[in-house]
């Protein structure tokens, strides 16, 4: 290793020159010690390989002959390769890509197959074509709706049923007990009694109510044109409301003066006596 190389390495590593030189010297010594051994191994390897390469054995010769014969007699697996390279051959083979059916077409084919199966099943079962179409369209089988149940709040309870029985029993018992005690006139048919009562009420009402006398015809009032015009003028320009000042003055005019009480007159006389000045005595 040159000094320039060693200096560059030391500068790149950032080590002091003294330490770097000592390390590089040690590495050079070790390399010089190992070099002769490496050279000896390389020489021995080359000597062993050279005779095999230079002097071919009988086995290698036989192998090369067989290989050359087979290579010349080989037939190409792909004949298009030879046609493509042949200059006399006019037609050139074009590789056509493999046609793949799209997935959409496969789905449509499956749908058609299912429809054909369903139609074949319907035809085997029988029926008109209209029914077949309806059955094919209505895939979901509709279940019949159950009848609605009556709500619980409309059902009679045990208490209400017992009360109804009690009232009916009481009515029947009262009829049995008090029916024989009534006079024979009261045992008449209820429908006849009701008709008699209605006839009696109608007669009494017709006797009591006085007959209405026919009302005299109304005579339309004749108004002059001047009255109608004055009424319109009053309605337009008559003051319906009063201002606050006018209303206060109107109240003061209509206000009644109450008579003074005796206590007020007595107090005024007393106050006047106090403030009265008497003549001084000389």
Curated annotation (Swiss-Prot):
It is found in: Cytoplasm, Cytoskeleton; Cytoplasm, Cytoskeleton, Spindle. Keywords: Cell cycle, Cell division, Chromosome partition, Cytoplasm, Cytoskeleton, Mitosis. The keyword Cell cycle applies. GO terms for cellular component: cellular bud neck; cytoplasm; nuclear microtubule; spindle. Residues 117-128 have a biased composition (Low complexity). Residues 242-268 have a biased composition (Polar residues). GO terms for molecular function: microtubule binding. Residues 28-58, 115-185, 207-229, 242-282 are annotated as: Disordered. The keyword Protein biosynthesis does not apply. GO terms for biological process: cell division; establishment of mitotic spindle localization; mitotic spindle elongation. Residues 163-175 have a biased composition (Basic and acidic residues). Belongs to the SHE1 family. May have a role related to the spindle integrity, which is essential for proper chromosome segregation. This is Mitotic spindle-associated protein SHE1. It comes from Candida glabrata (strain ATCC 2001 / BCRC 20586 / JCM 3761 / NBRC 0622 / NRRL Y-65 / CBS 138).
